[in-house]
Amino acid sequence: AGAAVSESGSWWLLDSNCKLLEETTAEEAKKYPVLSGVVLTAPVSGCAASAADPEQITVAQTLLTAMEQWDLVDVITTVDLSKLYGIVLWYGDRFEIDLGSTDNLAYKIQYLQEILKNLNDGQSGVIDLTFETETVARFLPW
């Protein structure tokens, strides 16, 4: 599974292609990145996930595929897609990763993986990958 998503009190696992794998428990869901801000519509095991905002599914698929490719699925705890102009990932409680808009998401995830390699274990803060002014990441310690 690539991620977990909560729907009306129940939890679903989905793969990186956003296919719903199975319903699961809240405890089991904690083992995967949680997609927050996504409202599933009529989830059915074995079918493609659909959401009230279909673009969220497209964005989730891009992010989950990139996270899988760059070995970040095990360390990202939350993928917040409630605002597609302000996407936020959480690396446990150590890092808030601001991705900004949906532009260049796969590149931003690749860039993130490089940044994480260079941060010390004791560091925590915000990793800004919004690229609002230039294509440069900024680290803002807490």
Please provide the spans of the model-predicted regions.
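Charged, solvent-exposed interaction patches on well-folded alpha/beta domains
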Residues: 1-142
